[in-house]
Amino acid sequence: MKFTTLTFIVATFICTISCSSDKKVSMELPMINLAKDYSNEKKNIHEIADVEYIPLETTDESILRGGWVSMSNEYIVIKDKDICFFDRKTGKYLWKFNRTGNSSEEYPMFNYLAVDFRSEECYIYTPIGNKVYVYTYHGDFKRVFALEVGKEFRLSIINDYNQDFLIGYNGFSYRKDPTLLDSHPYYLISKKDGKVSPLPLTVKRPINKKVKPTGDDGYMDSSMIICEMINLLVNENEAFIGDFALDTLYTVQDYKLTPVAVQSPSVFSGDIPLVLSADLFTDTYMGFYAIKLDADNAWKSITEAPYLYWNRKTGEVHRYELYDSNILTEKVYNPWMHNTNLNRNYGVTRLRAEFLVEQYEAGNLQGELKEIASKMDMEDNYVLVLCKFK
Protein backbone atom coordinates (compact mmCIF):
# COMPACT_ATOMS: atom_id res chain seq x y z
CA MET A 1 0.00 0.00 0.00
CA LYS A 2 1.30 3.45 -0.82
CA PHE A 3 1.44 5.96 2.00
CA THR A 4 1.81 9.69 1.40
CA THR A 5 0.61 12.71 3.32
CA LEU A 6 -2.66 10.82 3.82
CA THR A 7 -0.83 8.56 6.27
CA PHE A 8 0.16 11.60 8.29
CA ILE A 9 -3.42 12.84 8.35
CA VAL A 10 -4.77 9.48 9.50
CA ALA A 11 -2.04 9.37 12.13
CA THR A 12 -3.56 12.49 13.64
CA PHE A 13 -6.73 10.59 14.52
CA ILE A 14 -7.26 10.80 18.24
CA CYS A 15 -8.89 7.85 19.92
CA THR A 16 -9.61 8.00 23.64
CA ILE A 17 -9.11 4.24 23.84
CA SER A 18 -7.07 1.62 22.09
CA CYS A 19 -9.37 0.91 19.16
CA SER A 20 -8.62 -2.81 19.25
CA SER A 21 -9.50 -3.03 22.94
CA ASP A 22 -13.24 -2.93 22.59
CA LYS A 23 -14.05 -4.03 26.14
CA LYS A 24 -12.08 -1.29 27.91
CA VAL A 25 -14.65 1.40 27.20
CA SER A 26 -17.79 -0.55 28.09
CA MET A 27 -17.97 0.97 31.56
CA GLU A 28 -17.58 4.54 30.32
CA LEU A 29 -20.13 4.75 27.51
CA PRO A 30 -23.92 4.73 27.15
CA MET A 31 -25.17 1.14 27.02
CA ILE A 32 -27.68 0.06 24.35
CA ASN A 33 -29.53 -3.07 25.47
CA LEU A 34 -30.33 -5.21 22.42
CA ALA A 35 -31.77 -8.11 24.41
CA LYS A 36 -34.58 -6.18 26.09
CA ASP A 37 -38.11 -6.73 24.81
CA TYR A 38 -39.21 -3.17 24.06
CA SER A 39 -42.93 -2.53 23.76
CA ASN A 40 -44.26 -0.97 20.57
CA GLU A 41 -45.00 2.75 20.71
CA LYS A 42 -46.94 4.46 17.94
CA LYS A 43 -45.31 7.79 17.12
CA ASN A 44 -46.28 10.45 14.60
CA ILE A 45 -43.20 11.20 12.48
CA HIS A 46 -44.14 14.89 12.62
CA GLU A 47 -43.48 14.88 16.39
CA ILE A 48 -39.80 14.10 15.97
CA ALA A 49 -39.01 15.43 12.49
CA ASP A 50 -39.89 18.19 10.06
CA VAL A 51 -41.26 16.44 6.97
CA GLU A 52 -41.11 17.54 3.33
CA TYR A 53 -42.79 15.77 0.42
CA ILE A 54 -40.98 16.15 -2.91
CA PRO A 55 -42.82 14.62 -5.91
CA LEU A 56 -40.04 13.80 -8.39
CA GLU A 57 -41.16 14.88 -11.85
CA THR A 58 -41.87 12.06 -14.29
CA THR A 59 -40.72 12.53 -17.88
CA ASP A 60 -39.51 10.14 -20.57
CA GLU A 61 -35.98 10.95 -19.37
CA SER A 62 -36.54 10.63 -15.63
CA ILE A 63 -38.35 7.35 -14.97
CA LEU A 64 -37.01 5.95 -11.69
CA ARG A 65 -37.04 2.42 -10.34
CA GLY A 66 -35.67 3.33 -6.93
CA GLY A 67 -32.15 4.59 -6.44
CA TRP A 68 -29.88 6.04 -3.77
CA VAL A 69 -30.31 9.68 -2.78
CA SER A 70 -27.93 12.61 -2.39
CA MET A 71 -29.06 16.15 -1.78
CA SER A 72 -27.88 19.71 -1.26
CA ASN A 73 -29.80 22.95 -0.82
CA GLU A 74 -30.14 23.11 -4.62
CA TYR A 75 -30.29 19.56 -5.95
CA ILE A 76 -31.61 16.08 -5.35
CA VAL A 77 -29.42 13.51 -7.08
CA ILE A 78 -30.74 9.99 -7.63
CA LYS A 79 -28.35 7.18 -8.51
CA ASP A 80 -30.53 4.75 -10.44
CA LYS A 81 -29.64 3.30 -13.84
CA ASP A 82 -28.59 6.88 -14.64
CA ILE A 83 -27.52 9.76 -12.42
CA CYS A 84 -30.55 12.06 -12.36
CA PHE A 85 -30.65 15.63 -11.06
CA PHE A 86 -33.86 17.20 -9.72
CA ASP A 87 -34.59 20.59 -8.21
CA ARG A 88 -34.35 20.33 -4.42
CA LYS A 89 -37.45 22.41 -3.67
CA THR A 90 -39.85 21.49 -6.47
CA GLY A 91 -38.73 18.03 -7.62
CA LYS A 92 -38.58 19.26 -11.23
CA TYR A 93 -36.38 17.05 -13.42
CA LEU A 94 -33.26 18.89 -14.60
CA TRP A 95 -30.87 16.52 -16.38
CA LYS A 96 -29.12 13.17 -16.18
CA PHE A 97 -25.96 11.45 -17.35
CA ASN A 98 -24.67 7.93 -17.84
CA ARG A 99 -21.06 7.34 -18.88
CA THR A 100 -21.10 3.55 -19.03
CA GLY A 101 -18.74 2.28 -21.71
CA ASN A 102 -15.28 0.97 -22.50
CA SER A 103 -13.29 4.10 -23.28
CA SER A 104 -10.72 5.56 -20.89
CA GLU A 105 -13.23 8.22 -19.81
CA GLU A 106 -16.10 5.79 -19.17
CA TYR A 107 -16.83 3.32 -16.39
CA PRO A 108 -17.48 -0.33 -17.34
CA MET A 109 -19.69 -0.93 -14.32
CA PHE A 110 -21.54 1.42 -11.98
CA ASN A 111 -21.57 0.36 -8.31
CA TYR A 112 -21.49 3.37 -5.99
CA LEU A 113 -21.82 7.12 -6.26
CA ALA A 114 -20.50 9.81 -3.92
CA VAL A 115 -21.48 13.42 -4.69
CA ASP A 116 -19.29 16.30 -3.53
CA PHE A 117 -21.58 19.34 -3.54
CA ARG A 118 -18.69 21.65 -2.62
CA SER A 119 -16.65 20.94 -5.75
CA GLU A 120 -19.68 19.91 -7.85
CA GLU A 121 -18.13 16.53 -8.62
CA CYS A 122 -19.56 13.02 -8.91
CA TYR A 123 -17.32 10.13 -7.81
CA ILE A 124 -18.27 6.78 -9.32
CA TYR A 125 -16.69 3.57 -8.02
CA THR A 126 -16.40 0.39 -10.08
CA PRO A 127 -14.82 -2.85 -8.80
CA ILE A 128 -13.49 -3.54 -12.29
CA GLY A 129 -9.93 -2.35 -11.94
CA ASN A 130 -10.82 -0.91 -8.52
CA LYS A 131 -11.23 2.54 -10.01
CA VAL A 132 -12.97 5.79 -9.16
CA TYR A 133 -14.13 7.97 -12.06
CA VAL A 134 -14.70 11.67 -11.43
CA TYR A 135 -17.19 13.75 -13.44
CA THR A 136 -18.83 17.14 -13.31
CA TYR A 137 -22.51 17.45 -12.49
CA HIS A 138 -23.27 17.14 -16.20
CA GLY A 139 -21.11 14.06 -16.76
CA ASP A 140 -18.02 15.72 -18.21
CA PHE A 141 -14.97 13.58 -17.47
CA LYS A 142 -12.37 15.09 -15.12
CA ARG A 143 -10.08 12.29 -13.94
CA VAL A 144 -9.83 8.63 -12.96
CA PHE A 145 -7.67 6.90 -10.38
CA ALA A 146 -7.08 3.32 -9.32
CA LEU A 147 -7.19 2.41 -5.65
CA GLU A 148 -3.79 0.82 -5.14
CA VAL A 149 -4.00 -1.51 -2.17
CA GLY A 150 -1.67 -4.44 -1.55
CA LYS A 151 -4.40 -6.92 -0.61
CA GLU A 152 -7.83 -8.12 -1.64
CA PHE A 153 -9.92 -5.00 -1.81
CA ARG A 154 -13.37 -4.07 -3.02
CA LEU A 155 -15.44 -1.20 -1.73
CA SER A 156 -18.90 -2.19 -0.53
CA ILE A 157 -19.80 1.41 0.19
CA ILE A 158 -18.28 4.79 -0.59
CA ASN A 159 -19.39 8.20 0.60
CA ASP A 160 -18.30 11.81 0.74
CA TYR A 161 -16.40 12.56 3.97
CA ASN A 162 -15.00 16.09 3.58
CA GLN A 163 -13.50 18.38 0.96
CA ASP A 164 -10.38 16.23 0.64
CA PHE A 165 -11.46 12.65 1.23
CA LEU A 166 -14.02 9.97 0.56
CA ILE A 167 -14.72 7.31 3.17
CA GLY A 168 -15.29 3.67 2.33
CA TYR A 169 -15.53 0.10 3.55
CA ASN A 170 -13.54 -2.85 2.16
CA GLY A 171 -16.12 -5.47 1.26
CA PHE A 172 -13.53 -8.22 1.03
CA SER A 173 -13.56 -8.32 4.82
CA TYR A 174 -16.41 -10.81 4.61
CA ARG A 175 -14.66 -13.40 2.42
CA LYS A 176 -14.76 -16.94 3.85
CA ASP A 177 -10.98 -17.39 3.51
CA PRO A 178 -9.71 -16.04 6.88
CA THR A 179 -6.43 -14.95 5.29
CA LEU A 180 -8.37 -12.39 3.25
CA LEU A 181 -10.20 -10.85 6.18
CA ASP A 182 -9.28 -7.18 6.49
CA SER A 183 -8.67 -6.26 10.11
CA HIS A 184 -8.75 -2.53 9.22
CA PRO A 185 -11.63 -2.40 6.71
CA TYR A 186 -12.53 1.32 6.92
CA TYR A 187 -10.58 3.71 4.69
CA LEU A 188 -10.07 7.32 3.77
CA ILE A 189 -9.56 7.85 0.04
CA SER A 190 -7.91 10.95 -1.38
CA LYS A 191 -10.11 12.78 -3.88
CA LYS A 192 -7.03 14.07 -5.62
CA ASP A 193 -5.19 10.87 -6.50
CA GLY A 194 -6.99 7.93 -4.86
CA LYS A 195 -4.35 7.19 -2.25
CA VAL A 196 -5.93 5.13 0.53
CA SER A 197 -5.18 4.60 4.19
CA PRO A 198 -7.05 2.58 6.82
CA LEU A 199 -8.70 4.20 9.78
CA PRO A 200 -7.13 3.12 13.09
CA LEU A 201 -9.99 0.80 13.98
CA THR A 202 -9.13 -2.88 14.41
CA VAL A 203 -11.73 -5.55 13.61
CA LYS A 204 -10.20 -8.91 14.50
CA ARG A 205 -13.17 -11.12 13.64
CA PRO A 206 -15.11 -9.44 10.81
CA ILE A 207 -18.51 -10.99 10.27
CA ASN A 208 -20.79 -8.51 8.50
CA LYS A 209 -22.70 -10.48 5.87
CA LYS A 210 -21.22 -13.83 6.92
CA VAL A 211 -22.78 -15.44 9.92
CA LYS A 212 -21.75 -19.06 10.41
CA PRO A 213 -18.50 -19.62 12.33
CA THR A 214 -15.93 -21.93 10.76
CA GLY A 215 -14.00 -22.48 13.96
CA ASP A 216 -10.97 -20.61 12.73
CA ASP A 217 -12.04 -17.05 13.58
CA GLY A 218 -13.46 -16.67 10.09
CA TYR A 219 -17.04 -16.73 8.91
CA MET A 220 -18.38 -18.68 5.98
CA ASP A 221 -20.99 -17.78 3.39
CA SER A 222 -24.63 -18.37 4.13
CA SER A 223 -27.96 -17.25 2.76
CA MET A 224 -27.97 -14.38 5.24
CA ILE A 225 -27.79 -11.10 3.39
CA ILE A 226 -28.12 -7.80 5.22
CA CYS A 227 -28.91 -5.90 2.02
CA GLU A 228 -25.79 -3.74 2.01
CA MET A 229 -26.63 -2.51 5.49
CA ILE A 230 -22.99 -1.93 6.34
CA ASN A 231 -22.69 0.21 9.43
CA LEU A 232 -21.06 3.22 7.78
CA LEU A 233 -23.25 6.32 7.68
CA VAL A 234 -22.44 9.98 7.11
CA ASN A 235 -24.31 12.83 8.81
CA GLU A 236 -22.82 15.83 7.00
CA ASN A 237 -19.27 16.07 8.45
CA GLU A 238 -19.68 13.24 10.97
CA ALA A 239 -19.28 9.59 9.97
CA PHE A 240 -20.77 6.76 12.04
CA ILE A 241 -19.08 3.35 12.22
CA GLY A 242 -20.76 0.46 14.01
CA ASP A 243 -18.98 -2.64 12.80
CA PHE A 244 -21.03 -5.79 13.31
CA ALA A 245 -18.10 -7.57 14.97
CA LEU A 246 -17.49 -4.85 17.58
CA ASP A 247 -19.50 -3.99 20.65
CA THR A 248 -18.47 -0.34 20.53
CA LEU A 249 -19.95 2.27 18.17
CA TYR A 250 -17.81 5.13 16.87
CA THR A 251 -17.99 8.46 15.12
CA VAL A 252 -15.32 10.04 12.93
CA GLN A 253 -15.30 13.82 12.84
CA ASP A 254 -12.44 16.22 12.11
CA TYR A 255 -10.14 13.18 11.85
CA LYS A 256 -11.03 12.17 15.40
CA LEU A 257 -12.25 8.63 16.10
CA THR A 258 -14.53 8.72 19.14
CA PRO A 259 -16.45 5.88 20.86
CA VAL A 260 -20.05 6.94 21.49
CA ALA A 261 -21.88 3.87 22.82
CA VAL A 262 -21.57 0.15 23.45
CA GLN A 263 -24.09 -2.60 22.80
CA SER A 264 -25.16 -5.19 25.35
CA PRO A 265 -24.97 -8.14 25.34
CA SER A 266 -21.67 -8.51 23.55
CA VAL A 267 -21.83 -9.55 19.88
CA PHE A 268 -20.21 -12.92 20.55
CA SER A 269 -21.62 -13.59 24.02
CA GLY A 270 -24.03 -16.26 22.76
CA ASP A 271 -24.01 -19.07 20.23
CA ILE A 272 -25.56 -16.74 17.64
CA PRO A 273 -24.01 -13.29 17.06
CA LEU A 274 -26.32 -10.42 18.02
CA VAL A 275 -25.57 -7.30 16.00
CA LEU A 276 -26.72 -3.72 15.80
CA SER A 277 -27.42 -2.71 12.19
CA ALA A 278 -28.00 1.05 11.89
CA ASP A 279 -29.39 2.94 8.92
CA LEU A 280 -30.02 6.32 10.59
CA PHE A 281 -27.64 8.48 12.65
CA THR A 282 -28.52 12.08 13.49
CA ASP A 283 -27.60 14.45 16.31
CA THR A 284 -30.54 13.10 18.34
CA TYR A 285 -31.50 9.65 17.02
CA MET A 286 -29.90 6.45 15.86
CA GLY A 287 -32.31 4.07 14.12
CA PHE A 288 -31.25 0.43 13.97
CA TYR A 289 -32.20 -3.24 13.79
CA ALA A 290 -31.19 -5.69 16.52
CA ILE A 291 -30.43 -8.80 14.46
CA LYS A 292 -29.58 -12.33 15.55
CA LEU A 293 -27.37 -13.61 12.74
CA ASP A 294 -28.75 -17.14 12.66
CA ALA A 295 -27.51 -18.92 9.52
CA ASP A 296 -30.09 -21.68 9.95
CA ASN A 297 -32.99 -19.20 10.05
CA ALA A 298 -31.65 -16.43 7.86
CA TRP A 299 -34.91 -14.97 6.60
CA LYS A 300 -36.52 -15.09 10.02
CA SER A 301 -33.52 -13.28 11.50
CA ILE A 302 -34.21 -10.30 9.27
CA THR A 303 -38.02 -10.22 9.24
CA GLU A 304 -38.35 -10.59 13.01
CA ALA A 305 -35.58 -8.17 13.96
CA PRO A 306 -37.02 -5.25 15.96
CA TYR A 307 -36.34 -1.74 14.69
CA LEU A 308 -35.35 0.56 17.55
CA TYR A 309 -34.46 4.19 18.13
CA TRP A 310 -31.71 5.25 20.53
CA ASN A 311 -32.02 8.84 21.74
CA ARG A 312 -28.43 10.07 21.92
CA LYS A 313 -29.39 12.93 24.24
CA THR A 314 -31.44 11.03 26.81
CA GLY A 315 -29.93 7.56 26.42
CA GLU A 316 -33.40 6.02 26.08
CA VAL A 317 -34.23 3.27 23.58
CA HIS A 318 -37.71 3.08 22.04
CA ARG A 319 -39.44 0.74 19.63
CA TYR A 320 -41.34 3.36 17.68
CA GLU A 321 -43.85 2.46 15.02
CA LEU A 322 -43.63 5.65 13.01
CA TYR A 323 -46.71 6.75 11.13
CA ASP A 324 -47.58 9.86 9.15
CA SER A 325 -50.68 11.71 10.33
CA ASN A 326 -51.32 12.77 6.72
CA ILE A 327 -51.99 9.11 5.87
CA LEU A 328 -55.19 7.89 7.52
CA THR A 329 -54.30 4.23 7.32
CA GLU A 330 -51.64 2.19 9.06
CA LYS A 331 -48.32 2.51 7.30
CA VAL A 332 -45.14 2.22 9.33
CA TYR A 333 -41.97 3.53 7.80
CA ASN A 334 -38.53 4.32 9.11
CA PRO A 335 -36.51 7.06 7.38
CA TRP A 336 -32.99 5.96 6.51
CA MET A 337 -29.69 7.47 5.42
CA HIS A 338 -27.72 4.41 4.31
CA ASN A 339 -25.57 5.05 1.24
CA THR A 340 -26.82 8.62 0.99
CA ASN A 341 -25.33 12.10 1.15
CA LEU A 342 -27.93 14.30 2.83
CA ASN A 343 -28.08 17.57 4.69
CA ARG A 344 -27.39 17.24 8.40
CA ASN A 345 -29.94 15.29 10.46
CA TYR A 346 -31.98 14.20 7.45
CA GLY A 347 -33.37 10.77 6.70
CA VAL A 348 -35.35 9.77 3.62
CA THR A 349 -38.09 7.40 2.63
CA ARG A 350 -40.34 7.02 -0.41
CA LEU A 351 -44.06 6.87 -1.09
CA ARG A 352 -44.96 5.05 -4.30
CA ALA A 353 -47.33 6.75 -6.72
CA GLU A 354 -49.54 3.67 -6.83
CA PHE A 355 -49.96 3.70 -3.06
CA LEU A 356 -50.71 7.42 -2.94
CA VAL A 357 -53.27 7.29 -5.74
CA GLU A 358 -55.04 4.35 -4.11
CA GLN A 359 -55.13 6.07 -0.73
CA TYR A 360 -56.34 9.32 -2.29
CA GLU A 361 -59.20 7.56 -4.05
CA ALA A 362 -60.09 5.84 -0.77
CA GLY A 363 -60.15 9.17 1.08
CA ASN A 364 -57.22 8.23 3.31
CA LEU A 365 -54.98 11.24 2.70
CA GLN A 366 -55.04 14.74 4.10
CA GLY A 367 -52.97 17.91 4.09
CA GLU A 368 -50.15 18.35 1.60
CA LEU A 369 -50.08 14.67 0.67
CA LYS A 370 -53.72 14.82 -0.40
CA GLU A 371 -52.98 17.75 -2.70
CA ILE A 372 -49.92 16.03 -4.20
CA ALA A 373 -51.73 12.73 -4.78
CA SER A 374 -54.66 14.49 -6.47
CA LYS A 375 -52.32 15.38 -9.35
CA MET A 376 -50.58 12.01 -9.63
CA ASP A 377 -50.87 9.07 -11.98
CA MET A 378 -50.20 5.44 -11.07
CA GLU A 379 -47.11 5.40 -13.30
CA ASP A 380 -45.49 8.51 -11.85
CA ASN A 381 -42.22 8.55 -9.98
CA TYR A 382 -42.36 8.18 -6.22
CA VAL A 383 -42.67 11.04 -3.77
CA LEU A 384 -39.42 11.51 -1.88
CA VAL A 385 -40.05 12.12 1.81
CA LEU A 386 -37.32 14.17 3.50
CA CYS A 387 -37.35 14.01 7.29
CA LYS A 388 -35.22 16.46 9.25
CA PHE A 389 -34.98 15.04 12.76
CA LYS A 390 -35.35 17.50 15.62
Indicate where each model-derived feature is located.
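A short helix->beta-strand "capping" segment at the edge of beta-propeller domains
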Residues: L34-L64
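Short coil/turn segments at the loop-to-beta-strand junctions that recur within blades
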Residues: D60-E61, N98-E106, A146-R154, T202-I207, ...
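Asp-box/WD-like beta-propeller blade repeats and closely related beta-sheet repeat scaffolds
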Residues: P127-H184, P198-K212
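Structural signature of eukaryotic scaffold interfaces centered on beta-propeller domains
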Residues: G66-M71, N111-R118, S156-Q163, N170-F172, ...
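Conserved blade-ending motifs and adjacent loop-strand segments that build the rim/top face
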Residues: T258-A278, R312-R344, V357
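Beta-propeller blade signature
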Residues: V134-Y137, L181-G194, L246-Y250, S301-G315, ...
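C-terminal motif of bacterial Sec signal peptides marking the signal peptidase cleavage site
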Residues: C15-S18
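Blade-loop segments of beta-propeller domains
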Residues: E57-E61, K92-P127, V149-G150
